[in-house]
């Protein structure tokens, strides 16, 4: 097992999703302050309109 850094995204129905921080170039709050914009290293963008817990630790199997 190896310790990796993830961004933890809490969805409105209290389920969580994890994005591997190694794939993320940067992220920032959007204009409406409820949206988080994630820029990936491969050039893709993702807009998250949910609560984001940045740099959450998670053990990856």
Residue ranges of model-derived segments:
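Acidic, Ser/Thr- and proline-rich intrinsically disordered linker/docking segments
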Residues: 1-18, 23-61
């Amino acid at each position: 097992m190896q310790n990796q850094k993830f961004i933890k995204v809490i969805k409105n129905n209290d389920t969580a999703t994890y994005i591997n921080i190694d794939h993320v170039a940067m992220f920032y709050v959007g204009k409406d302050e409820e949206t988080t914009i994630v820029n990936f290293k491969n050039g893709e963008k993702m807009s998250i309109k949910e609560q984001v817990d940045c740099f959450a630790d998670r053990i990856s199997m």
